[in-house]
Amino acid sequence: MQEIERVVDFLQREELTLTTAESCTCGLMASLMGDIPGCGQVLDSGFVVYSPKAKNRLLKVDFETIERFGLTSEEVAREMAIGALNASVAIIAVSNTGVADDDQEDEGGTQCYAYALMRGERQVVVSETVQFDGDRVAIRKQAARHGLTQLP
C-alpha cells in the first residue's frame, strides 16, 4: 500500500486532483486511492466504463475509434482519459482499457493506459501498453497499481 500512499502524497504536494477512467480494472484504481487517508483531497471522480456504449455515452469515446483500433488500444485509452478530464474538474486523468483473459484479438494481460494532464488551457496526453501475467484477478490488480504508480 506504500506505493499508493506515495501517489496520494505526490498529488497532495503538487496540488493535483485526479479522475480515473477504468474499463478492465472496473474501479480498482479509484478503490485503491480510497484506501488511503486524505485521498478525498486529491480524488475528484472515477468512471467505470466497461461497455463501448458507456465509453461513448460518459466519456465521448468515438465509436469509430473503437471500431478502427479495438477496445484494447492506446487510442481508446487516450480518448477515455481526455473524456474523463472534460467530464470532471480534475487536473490529471488516468485511463485503463485491456483484457484480463485471452480473446480473439488480444492476449490476456494486455493493458493500455493514457494519462491526460491540463496545462493551462492545453491537454497533454501520453499513453502506453503493458503486458501482465497471471489469472484474471491478478492481472486486474497489477493493472490498477501500475496505472496509479506511474503518476509520480
Per-range role (PLM):
Residues 1-152:
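Short alpha-helical segments enriched in small residues
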